[in-house]
């Protein structure tokens, strides 16, 4: 189905800079997200028909569309995030490419281009309307496509009361891209049986498995002396960091793994001979493998300290989120419904693990099972990001189908 306000709504959203800031200590991490929620989303939530609309100190804009059929007793939530990733989000100037011809798309005058030779996903979209960047910023389809789709679904349901639906709760939240947006989510206030994050990629994505995730902060303490007299005196912290890294499995890196394979990822290293700080992330799907990865890092640190005869390697491990499969597989109702709706719409469900996390990873462990459905974005987090309007329309269809489902 086509929705006349969907494209303009999306274009309005992406032109607002809502980039999050991992170094901030506030919630939300940037004032622009507060302004976007209170000045743009809250008024529009009311206009499209949501009731009891409010903004919480945790950064979430919340609203409700009451059920219009007493036989549909479920309460279902839909959640998308306002923030965009760590890439330029100022001056977003989207291009609308109607009836895409399958060829190269020049991204404004930036010198960058979307070429099917480099981005095979483009081969799926001839004849469709694509929204791209102008090459100077990201687009923000992650996850403003999700926000636009949820808002459009509510607008359509309000205008078509003949479509019977259950109670719907909507939540637009902050700081998903920096991994803290759902930390303060109020599950008791949201009060639904289950929810969906509308934060996936291509048409048909339906995901209920995520990584389990941890962060590892390492400090290597060296001893700097003049290199000319360094023998048996100098301890080079840079070398300690290299030695530590070289004891991790060589092939367990993001660029060498896929599917259900986990990894260690060195994110940042700073320092000198005297001291070095290094940051890693640890990812795996199975709980035992996840715990084993953390234990392995601790074992390496302990072994190095024992060999050095002093405590020169300090490791701090912090769990970040867990595989939501552990919660959702106890009651697969949200997956069963979404899968059935997609199939009824002629959409082939693509059920595969997310090699990452969503707000649903944390919300599921707060008592609300929250799988993820497609929002349409491709090449997210950079200048090559784009989305198909037709895929966004199918996401709206899917949301409407889920809340009207009577099985």
From Swiss-Prot:
<feature type="binding site">
    <location>
        <position position="199"/>
    </location>
    <ligand>
        <name>Zn(2+) 1</name>
    </ligand>
</feature>
<dbReference type="GO" id="GO:0008237">
    <property type="term" value="F:metallopeptidase activity"/>
</dbReference>
<dbReference type="Pfam" id="PF01546">
    <property type="entry name" value="Peptidase_M20"/>
</dbReference>
<dbReference type="GO" id="GO:0006508">
    <property type="term" value="P:proteolysis"/>
</dbReference>
<keyword id="KW-0963">Cytoplasm</keyword>
<feature type="binding site">
    <location>
        <position position="177"/>
    </location>
    <ligand>
        <name>Zn(2+) 2</name>
    </ligand>
</feature>
<dbReference type="GO" id="GO:0005829">
    <property type="term" value="C:cytosol"/>
</dbReference>
<dbReference type="InterPro" id="IPR001261">
    <property type="entry name" value="ArgE/DapE_CS"/>
</dbReference>
<feature type="binding site">
    <location>
        <position position="81"/>
    </location>
    <ligand>
        <name>Zn(2+) 1</name>
    </ligand>
</feature>
<comment type="similarity">
    <text>Belongs to the peptidase M20B family.</text>
</comment>
<keyword id="KW-0378">Hydrolase</keyword>
<feature type="binding site">
    <location>
        <position position="142"/>
    </location>
    <ligand>
        <name>Zn(2+) 2</name>
    </ligand>
</feature>
<dbReference type="Pfam" id="PF07687">
    <property type="entry name" value="M20_dimer"/>
</dbReference>
<dbReference type="GO" id="GO:0045148">
    <property type="term" value="F:tripeptide aminopeptidase activity"/>
</dbReference>
<dbReference type="InterPro" id="IPR010161">
    <property type="entry name" value="Peptidase_M20B"/>
</dbReference>
<feature type="binding site">
    <location>
        <position position="381"/>
    </location>
    <ligand>
        <name>Zn(2+) 2</name>
    </ligand>
</feature>
<keyword id="KW-0862">Zinc</keyword>
<comment type="function">
    <text>Cleaves the N-terminal amino acid of tripeptides.</text>
</comment>
<feature type="active site" description="Proton acceptor">
    <location>
        <position position="176"/>
    </location>
</feature>
<keyword id="KW-0031">Aminopeptidase</keyword>
<dbReference type="GO" id="GO:0043171">
    <property type="term" value="P:peptide catabolic process"/>
</dbReference>
<keyword id="KW-0479">Metal-binding</keyword>
<dbReference type="InterPro" id="IPR002933">
    <property type="entry name" value="Peptidase_M20"/>
</dbReference>
<dbReference type="InterPro" id="IPR011650">
    <property type="entry name" value="Peptidase_M20_dimer"/>
</dbReference>
<dbReference type="GO" id="GO:0008270">
    <property type="term" value="F:zinc ion binding"/>
</dbReference>
<keyword id="KW-0645">Protease</keyword>
<feature type="binding site">
    <location>
        <position position="142"/>
    </location>
    <ligand>
        <name>Zn(2+) 1</name>
    </ligand>
</feature>
<keyword id="KW-0482">Metalloprotease</keyword>
<dbReference type="InterPro" id="IPR036264">
    <property type="entry name" value="Bact_exopeptidase_dim_dom"/>
</dbReference>
<protein>
    <recommendedName>
        <fullName>Peptidase T</fullName>
        <ecNumber>3.4.11.4</ecNumber>
    </recommendedName>
</protein>
<feature type="active site">
    <location>
        <position position="83"/>
    </location>
</feature>
């Amino acid at each position: 189905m086509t929705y006349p306000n969907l494209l303009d709504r999306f274009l309005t959203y992406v032109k607002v800079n809502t980039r999050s800031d991992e170094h901030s200590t506030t919630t939300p991490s940037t004032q622009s997200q507060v302004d976007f929620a209170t000045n743009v989303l809250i008024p529009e939530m009311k206009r499209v028909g949501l009731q009891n609309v409010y903004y919480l100190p945790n950064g979430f804009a919340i609203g409700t569309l009451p059920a219009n059929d007493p036989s549909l007793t479920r309460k279902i939530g839909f959640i998308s995030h306002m923030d965009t990733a760590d890439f330029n989000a100022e001056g977003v100037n989207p291009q609308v490419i109607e009836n895409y011809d399958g060829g190269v798309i020049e991204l404004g005058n930036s010198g960058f281009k979307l070429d099917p030779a480099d981005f095979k996903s483009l081969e799926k979209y001839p004849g469709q309307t694509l929204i791209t960047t102008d090459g100077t910023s990201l687009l923000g389809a992650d996850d403003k496509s999700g926000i636009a789709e949820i808002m459009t679904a509510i607008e359509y349901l309000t205008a078509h009361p003949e479509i019977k639906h259950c109670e719907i709760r909507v939540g637009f939240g902050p700081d998903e891209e920096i991994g803290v947006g759902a930390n303060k989510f109020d599950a008791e206030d949201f009060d639904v049986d289950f929810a969906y994050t509308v934060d996936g990629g291509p048409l048909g994505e339906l995901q209920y498995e995520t990584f389990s995730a941890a962060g590892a902060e390492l400090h290597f303490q060296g001893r700097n002396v003049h290199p000319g007299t360094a023998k048996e005196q100098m301890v080079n912290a840079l070398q300690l960091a290299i030695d530590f890294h070289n004891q991790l499995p060589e092939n367990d890196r993001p660029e060498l793994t896929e599917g259900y394979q986990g990894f260690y990822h060195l994110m940042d290293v700073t320092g000198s001979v005297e001291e070095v700080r290094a940051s890693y992330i640890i990812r795996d799907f199975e709980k035992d493998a996840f715990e084993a990865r953390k234990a392995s890092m601790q074992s390496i640190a302990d072994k190095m300290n024992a060999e050095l005869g002093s405590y020169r390697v300090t490791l701090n491990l912090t769990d970040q989120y867990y595989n939501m499969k552990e919660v959702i597989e106890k009651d697969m109702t949200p997956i069963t419904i979404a899968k059935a709706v997609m199939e009824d719409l002629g959409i082939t469900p693509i059920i595969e693990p997310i090699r990452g996390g969503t707000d649903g990873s944390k919300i599921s462990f707060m008592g609300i099972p929250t799988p993820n459905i497609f929002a349409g974005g491709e090449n997210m987090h950079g200048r090559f990001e784009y989305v198909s309007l037709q895929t966004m329309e199918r996401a709206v269809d899917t949301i409407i189908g889920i809340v009207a489902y009577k099985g």
